[in-house]
Amino acid sequence: MRVMGIDCGSEYTGFGIVESDDRARLHCIVAGAVHLSARDPLENKLAKIFRELCSVIREHDPEVVAIEDVFYAVNAKSALKLGHVRGVAMLAVAECGLRVATYAPLAVKSAVVGYGKAEKCQVQAMVARLLNLPQVPEPADVADALAIAICHLHTSATLTRMHAKA
């Protein structure tokens, strides 16, 4: 299965596509980030995210896309900006005819690190280890996107095994 993870951010929106082979080994297909300039108007930032995510989806053909659930931020303005980015990311996914799976941040960290309150550096290190990457993914948004994809792969594999036993 090939899964794209997206980590929505107002400065960087990370993306990563991870594939699980028939032996459940994980492989990083592509990873990167859409860098957004603080000087650009919001509508230009959102258009850039939309275009670049659509391009990655069309080029690498994931079967499903996973995104983190909305979390509650202390700063309402920041939460609103992230909501815009998340909405545009979901629109890009829908435009490409794919479905979106969502996961709570605690679930992502638990699936990748084994601890729901893991630090960013722990997530980055574990993502690099699980994907056999030569270095830790940077910026952290890229590692987070890969972690979201890994979370979906682990979760769907567990659900498949559970249904097979039933």
Swiss-Prot record:
**Keyword Transmembrane carried by entry:** no
The record lists the catalysed reaction(s) as:
Endonucleolytic cleavage at a junction such as a reciprocal single-stranded crossover between two homologous DNA duplexes (Holliday junction)
Keywords (alphabetical) are:
Cytoplasm, DNA damage, DNA recombination, DNA repair, DNA-binding, Endonuclease, Hydrolase, Magnesium, Metal-binding, Nuclease
Q: Which Pfam families match?
A: RuvC
Q: Which family does it belong to?
A: Belongs to the RuvC family.
Share what the entry says about its subunit structure, partners included.
Answer: Homodimer which binds Holliday junction (HJ) DNA. The HJ becomes 2-fold symmetrical on binding to RuvC with unstacked arms; it has a different conformation from HJ DNA in complex with RuvA. In the full resolvosome a probable DNA-RuvA(4)-RuvB(12)-RuvC(2) complex forms which resolves the HJ.
What the protein does comes down to: The RuvA-RuvB-RuvC complex processes Holliday junction (HJ) DNA during genetic recombination and DNA repair. Endonuclease that resolves HJ intermediates. Cleaves cruciform DNA by making single-stranded nicks across the HJ at symmetrical positions within the homologous arms, yielding a 5'-phosphate and a 3'-hydroxyl group; requires a central core of homology in the junction. The consensus cleavage sequence is 5'-(A/T)TT(C/G)-3'. Cleavage occurs on the 3'-side of the TT dinucleotide at the point of strand exchange.
Cofactor detail note: Binds 2 Mg(2+) ion per subunit.
This enzyme's EC code(s): 3.1.21.10
The UniProt record gives the binding positions of Mg(2+) 2 as E68
Q: Which domain of life is it from?
A: Bacteria
A GO molecular function annotation here is: DNA binding
Report the protein name in the record.
Crossover junction endodeoxyribonuclease RuvC
